[in-house]
């Protein structure tokens, strides 16, 4: 290809799966370029040495496989959860939040190895192409980016299978012996798309679920846990301090066993189309419920309501790929400031797909039992003060009502 004719070395975001293995071979054969592979361990639960062996089989000399789980949760997942972030009221952004970190390392490795370009396996129809590339350009405005799905002649995954067969690239099968769903996974979630899921009228088959038990098959006995928070981040489970990645992995285990975190969603992609995906976010679902509970105790009403107003915009920025944008950083600064006193413990009951808050406590609590009691408050609150409060707040409403009455009388 003429537009890539001067490229001699490319860093490829490589999962070891079918798509990126074909891309690796395509880059080698089409561009005659040396390919460096980068595989990020974000807690996807796969055997990453398999990716190394596949890369070696395809002739790759420089292979990067890095454990980024702690950085992923500490610097990306937790900051996002401080905002109680959900996209379109439901999606916990498990795929979206992983892309900036992968792009960051692609740019760094390109610099370390003297590569001319980076490459990714995102299709030309999806959000990930935008997320990868916006993040990369934010960190290196001059980087060259190769997106094979937008350049090659393959039109479908069937074409990919034929290319793989011709070049003896192994093709994975699902539990039914067929080509697998399009799956993305990390420590926060897993997502499945394609095949039968492309019809939003049909239910997802049970074998699609890879992270959770069915709620019907979950234990009949509830599980109770206590989650500890400091400055808005979860720091402990049942009194035991854990690192960010270890804590999320433990929450995933609790969520998996109790059938928590399944989501069947039709969402609006950034590129303009609607898509249907099936998501499993067991630990994240528990974390969100607990964080909202501790905030309810420690966050001032005005700050809490402002956060709720800002959150959809913040979620949209992450979903669209603007993690490194100035506006996301501005919002993050405000969100982080709001978390200064968000600390304490939340007790949760996990039962057959449900996360039920049973209690919350904090040394920084704004809750006053003296003020809200139905019993004698010993003078903590004078109910007669409410009369003036109501009159002042009703002033404009009464003025408007009188105007309406006057207009009706004139008729």
UniProtKB/Swiss-Prot annotation:
L-aspartate binds at residues 123, 127-128. It catalyses: L-citrulline + L-aspartate + ATP = 2-(N(omega)-L-arginino)succinate + AMP + diphosphate + H(+). Its main location: cytoplasm. One of its GO terms (biological process) is urea cycle. Its EC number is 6.3.4.5. It comes from the Bacteria. Keywords: Amino-acid biosynthesis, Arginine biosynthesis, ATP-binding, Cytoplasm, Ligase, Nucleotide-binding. It is an enzyme of class 6 (ligase). It is found in: Cytoplasm. GO terms for molecular function: argininosuccinate synthase activity; ATP binding. L-citrulline binds at residues 91, 96, 127, 131, 182, 191, 267, 279. ATP binds at residues 13-21, 40, 121. Pathway: Amino-acid biosynthesis; L-arginine biosynthesis; L-arginine from L-ornithine and carbamoyl phosphate: step 2/3. Pfam families: Arginosuc_syn_C, Arginosuc_synth. GO terms for cellular component: cytoplasm. Homotetramer. Belongs to the argininosuccinate synthase family. Type 1 subfamily. This is Argininosuccinate synthase. It comes from Bartonella tribocorum (strain CIP 105476 / IBS 506).
């Amino acid at each position: 290809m003429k537009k890539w004719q001067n490229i001699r070395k490319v860093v490829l975001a490589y999962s070891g799966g079918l798509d990126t293995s074909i891309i690796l071979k395509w880059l080698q054969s089409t561009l005659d370029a040396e390919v460096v592979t980068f595989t990020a361990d974000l807690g996807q639960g796969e055997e990453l040495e398999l990716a190394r062996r596949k890369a070696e089989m395809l002739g790759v000399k420089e292979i990067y496989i890095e454990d980024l789980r702690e950085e992923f949760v500490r610097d990306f997942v937790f900051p996002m959860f401080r905002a109680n972030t959900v996209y379109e009221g439901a999606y916990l952004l498990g795929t979206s939040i992983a892309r900036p970190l992968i792009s960051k390392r692609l740019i760094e490795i390109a610099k370390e190895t003297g590569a001319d370009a980076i490459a990714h396996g995102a299709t030309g129809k999806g959000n990930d192409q935008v997320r990868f590339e916006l993040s990369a350009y934010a960190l290196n405005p001059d980087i060259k980016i190769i997106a094979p799905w937008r350049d090659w002649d393959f039109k479908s995954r069937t074409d990919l299978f034929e290319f793989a067969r011709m070049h003896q690239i192994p093709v994975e099968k699902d539990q039914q012996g067929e080509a697998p769903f399009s799956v993305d996974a990390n420590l926060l979630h897993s997502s499945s798309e394609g095949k039968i899921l492309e019809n939003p009228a049909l239910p997802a088959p049970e074998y699609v679920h890879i992270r959770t038990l069915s709620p019907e098959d979950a234990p009949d006995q509830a599980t109770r846990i206590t989650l500890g928070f400091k400055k808005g981040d979860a720091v402990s489970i049942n009194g035991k301090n854990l690192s960010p990645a270890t804590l999320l992995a433990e929450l995933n285990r609790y969520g998996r066993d109790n059938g928590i975190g399944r989501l069947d969603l039709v969402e609006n992609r950034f590129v303009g189309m609607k898509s249907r995906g099936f998501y499993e976010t067991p630990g994240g679902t528990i974390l969100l419920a607990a964080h909202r509970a501790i905030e309810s105790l420690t966050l001032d009403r005005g700050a809490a309501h402002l956060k709720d107003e800002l959150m959809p915009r913040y979620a949209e920025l992450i979903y669209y790929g603007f993690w490194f944008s100035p506006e996301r950083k501005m919002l993050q600064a405000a969100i982080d400031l709001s978390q200064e006193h968000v600390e304490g413990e939340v007790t949760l009951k996990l039962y057959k797909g449900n996360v039920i808050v049973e209690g919350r406590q904090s040394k920084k609590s704004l809750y006053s039992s003296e003020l809200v009691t139905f019993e004698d408050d010993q003078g903590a609150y004078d109910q007669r003060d409410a009369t003036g409060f109501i009159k002042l707040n009703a002033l404009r409403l009464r003025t408007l009502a009188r105007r309406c009455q006057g207009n009706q009388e004139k008729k």
